Design a protein with these regions (language model features):
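Basic, polar low-complexity surface loops/patches
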Residues: 1-102
Length: 102
């Protein structure tokens, strides 16, 4: 199964293991914070975000410029969120953009 994952998906899963169980990982991908898998299923109705799929993987996303309002919705719903930001410029990154929990 791990061989079927893209480098970005492997990066996401590695970062997901760094946060407390049950926390929703908001993963910066370009102009959006994306949520995948169970995080997307849980977060999409709270955030009013459309649940879609990339392959068989559930996902939803919110625009990065509106992050504070979406974080407030998760917190009001009693959820914990972890932010994962791009820590290098995607235009100059060689290969996968480095990301860290911030």
């Amino acid at each position: 199964m791990a061989d079927e994952l893209t480098p970005m998906q492997r990066q996401y899963l590695a970062l997901k293991r760094e946060i407390p169980p049950g926390a929703i990982l908001m993963f910066r991908l370009g102009d959006f914070y994306e949520m995948f898998g169970e995080d997307a299923v849980v977060a999409s109705p709270i955030l009013g975000a459309t649940l879609s799929h990339r392959g068989s993987q559930p996902m939803c996303g919110v625009p990065h410029h509106a992050l504070n309002s979406y974080l407030a919705k998760l917190i009001r719903a009693g959820k914990t969120a972890a932010l994962c930001d791009q820590v290098e410029d995607p235009k100059t990154a060689r290969g996968l953009v480095r990301r860290e929990i911030t």
